[in-house]
Every structure is written in C-alpha cells, then in structure tokens.
A protein has these predicted regions:
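N-terminal beta-alpha supersecondary unit
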Residues: 1-67
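Short amphipathic alpha-helical face segments that pack within enzyme cores
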Residues: 41-45, 80, 84, 101
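Phosphate-handling active-site elements
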Residues: 51-59, 86-96, 111-114
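DPxDG-like acidic metal-binding loop motif
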Residues: 64-98
Length: 199
C-alpha cells in the first residue's frame, strides 16, 4: 500500500488541505480569506477531505505541514493541528518550507529548463518580503540560499534580492506583484507569477 499523506498549508491568508495516495492527489481544497480564520476552517476542511476520500485518520501514513516562513498565528494553527493528528495516530510529521512550495507553482505554467533559477517571495507586510532562491534540477528544486527577510523599495539592489544573477529571473509567490511594483521597472526581463502556497 502506498503512503497516504495529509498535507496542510496555513502560512498565508490561503488555508488549504490535500490528501495524497502515493504521488496522486486524491482530494484538495483551498480557501482564500480576507482575514485569518484558519482556526475555524482547518478541522472541518480536514474532516471533509477524509470523508471525500473515504479515509479514516487511522489510514494516514504521515502529515505534512508548511513550516514557514509566514503568519505566526497561521503557522501555529497548522503545526498544532498536524502535531495533534500525528500524536493521536502515531505517525510522522513532515515539515516543508513554504517558499519551496511556492517555487513549485512555476511548474503549473509549463515545463521548466534544467538549471532555471526561481525566486520564491512571500508577503511579510509593509515593504518586506520573505524570499529564497531555488534551482530546478529536472526533478526537484534545490535551495541556493537560506530564507531571508528583506525590505524591498525602489532603491533595492537587485543583487540583494536575487544574488544568483538577474537574467531571466522567475519570481513566484503571493508577493510577486508587490515585488514587481516596489522595484518600479528595475527588473526588466523578469517573469512574475502570483501564487499562494498550497497543500
């Protein structure tokens, strides 16, 4: 029997739940909210997902949860819920970087060349973003640097934002439009893709 994994994402305004049977997603639900209401949405979403798949909690092999960066309250809700399920079912908890999940959204628009560099950006409020650069290996994204919190404004040096070089950069995440706007045309030739991390 293949691994059955419950995936949770609560690091942004978007709250999502997905169930995987091996590599196949058998159920996914996402809600985007104006204000964080994950505490009231998450458990009903998990229950609905399990019912839709015909699974019980005891059928789960592991729970995967976004470990940040992101909203402190959202991360706390997701992590606490995941830990509770893992403890009750005696199954492992898998922590996943929220920015890495955002990087994978690039694959939704088409194939990516091996060696392509993607900058994942997440809104940290005001003129700040969380960011991390990744390189596509053909099978996965490999981190090129650590997660950073940056203030982005019109005078921001592109090298500080994207230390691996700026030619043909792909910027993806819920702060892609904000980053493009704040750079005020300094990022010509870059591709910006707005996306929320999802389970």
């Amino acid at each position: 029997m293949s691994a059955r994994i419950l995936a949770l994402e609560t690091s942004t305004l978007s709250c999502s739940v997905a169930l995987f049977d091996g590599n196949a997603c058998v159920h996914a639900e996402q809600r985007c909210e104006e204000q964080h209401v994950h505490a009231s949405n998450l458990l009903p979403m998990i229950d609905a997902a399990l019912k839709a798949a015909g699974w019980q909690g005891s059928d789960l092999s592991a729970v995967a949860v976004c470990a940040g960066p992101g909203s402190y309250t959202g991360l706390r809700i997701g992590t606490s819920t995941a830990k509770g399920i893992c403890h009750a079912q005696s199954i492992p908890l898998i922590a996943i970087n929220s920015l890495e999940i955002q990087a994978y959204h690039v694959l939704n628009i088409g194939p990516l060349h091996v060696g392509s560099t993607v900058l994942a950006v997440m809104d940290a409020r005001r003129d700040e973003i969380y960011t991390q650069a990744f390189r596509w290996s053909g099978e996965r994204f490999d981190a090129l640097d650590k997660t950073r919190a940056l203030v982005i404004d019109a005078s921001a040096a592109l090298d500080a934002l994207f230390p691996q070089g700026t030619d043909g950069a792909i910027v993806v995440g819920d702060a892609a439009e904000k980053t493009q706007r704040l750079l005020k045309g300094k990022a010509s030739g870059w591709t910006f893709i707005a996306a929320h991390p999802t389970a």
